[in-house]
Amino acid sequence: MDAFVVLVFILSCLFLLSLWRQSSERGKLPPGPTPLPLIGNFFQIDVKDISGSLTNFSKVYGPVFTLYLGRKPAVVLHGYEAVKEALIDHGEEFAGRGSFPMAERYNKGLGIVFSNGNRWKDIRRFSLMALRSLGMGKRSIEDRVQEEAQCLVEELRKTNGSPCDPTFILSCAPCNVICSIIFQNRFDYTDQDFLTFMEKVNENVRILSSPWLQVCNNFPSLIDYCPGSHHTITKNVNYIRSYLSEKIKEHQETLDVANPRDFIDYYLIKLKQGNYNQQSEFTLENLATTVRDLFAAGTETTSTTLRYALLLLLKHPHVTAKVQEEIDQVVGRHRNPCMQDRSHMPYTDAMIHEVQRFIDLIPTNLPHAVTCDIKFRDYFIPKGTTIITSLSSVLHDSKEFPNPEVFDPGHFLDKNGKFKKSDYFMPFSTGKRMCAGEGLARMELFLFLTTILQNFKLKSLVHPKDIDTTPVVNGLASLPPSYQLCFIPV
């Protein structure tokens, strides 16, 4: 009995200590809902609609508030003004990468997405340089995307106008563009090694967007001891790591320092130059992780946006008709669309922007962290605190985009029908951590969609009013429901 009393006393003390520590921290941080010991505010958040939960909290606590994800606090920025003030006006201080236990487990602080400090700066700077050298923003990259767009059209023709799920084909195209940049070569859509690699990358992104993974990230101790889809990520990462190791080995054996062929070659040259420096961030392990990051960030995100775009065009046939009319007027039927066409196609440009705004692909962005102690809007945020930026609150701001829950390309058109830019358009985030592949993604979306609509009419299997565009998953990423359509050659 005495032992039981002692145990209860110890547990009570730990409980009170946890309450005291959280109370002390909350006195310095922005206000927020009262957390429970150990689990924080987890049960106050709808893991199937995190953005909706953040919006509800912001109505009570304002645009800057604190949530406890497990035992650790995170500061949430809600609305354009708060997000801009942090990520742009105080970009350096908010440029850290916040806690993401599942990614940290496999990336070990390496790569371009989840690294921090000088390591992140060095790898990002190098990656941007290498991509520019390979033609990013130039005609050479555009040629690759146009080539892939024609391959995509040929694959769609093979459906013979029959109902099909576009997921597979729309995944192959952007993945092949990344392959041509990383490995020099594209792959046939029937290449089994390519297909397996692509599926492993895409499956990991889907799992990371699931509600269960939000639980794992908040309570990382579950990762080792609980069954679940997170173990599939481990198997996939091991496969991807092995696949990339073979590719890197092939590049090492055929490397010509005077004639780099692709991203891996540029990295291997940089690695050779840094061999004398024991502190160099350029290692083979970091190369494999960086390449894995480039695939994860540059394939599933673009293919998901393409899938969502076609679904929205099926839902809104009047929009599709206007886009195809503009394609006929500007491009015609006898040449391939090119990036120079975009400035002459304001409605098409507006449609693509509206797709990205409406679907809100990464609702709460990847977590940031402050790189130093900072006073922000009269609140004290300690170094290392995780920062959650609600991109949903910016992309669906009703002042900037009237009726934001309605799909309307007019959100990006002025009264004269010309394309209208918006500072609120930040599907790729903003500031220091803005997506390094934004330019490539914008090029792919324009060229793939215009080439598809130049060559096919889209036919839905159901009436447009019966098409549901509600995302089936709304965690890390918003994923569209499965659907079928017919590509009718024109």
Curated annotation (Swiss-Prot):
One annotated GO molecular function: iron ion binding
Keywords: Endoplasmic reticulum, Heme, Iron, Membrane, Metal-binding, Microsome, Monooxygenase, Oxidoreductase
Induction (free text): P450 can be induced to high levels in liver and other tissues by various foreign compounds, including drugs, pesticides, and carcinogens.
Record-level GO cellular component terms: endoplasmic reticulum membrane
Membrane topology (UniProt): Peripheral membrane protein
InterPro entries: Cyt_P450, Cyt_P450_CS, Cyt_P450_E_grp-I, Cyt_P450_sf, Cytochrome_P450_fam2
Any single biological process term in GO: organic acid metabolic process
Keyword 4Fe-4S among UniProt keywords: no
Cited Pfam families: p450
Cofactor(s) the protein requires to work: heme
Catalytic activity: an organic molecule + reduced [NADPH--hemoprotein reductase] + O2 = an alcohol + oxidized [NADPH--hemoprotein reductase] + H2O + H(+)
Entry binding sites for heme: 435
Tissue specificity of this protein: Specifically expressed by males in kidneys. Expressed predominantly by males in livers.
Similarity comment text for this entry: Belongs to the cytochrome P450 family.
Role noted for this protein: Catalyzes the hydroxylation of tolbutamide and the N-demethylation of aminopyrine and benzphetamine.
Name assigned to this protein: Cytochrome P450 2C27
Species, as recorded: Mesocricetus auratus
Name of the coding gene: CYP2C27
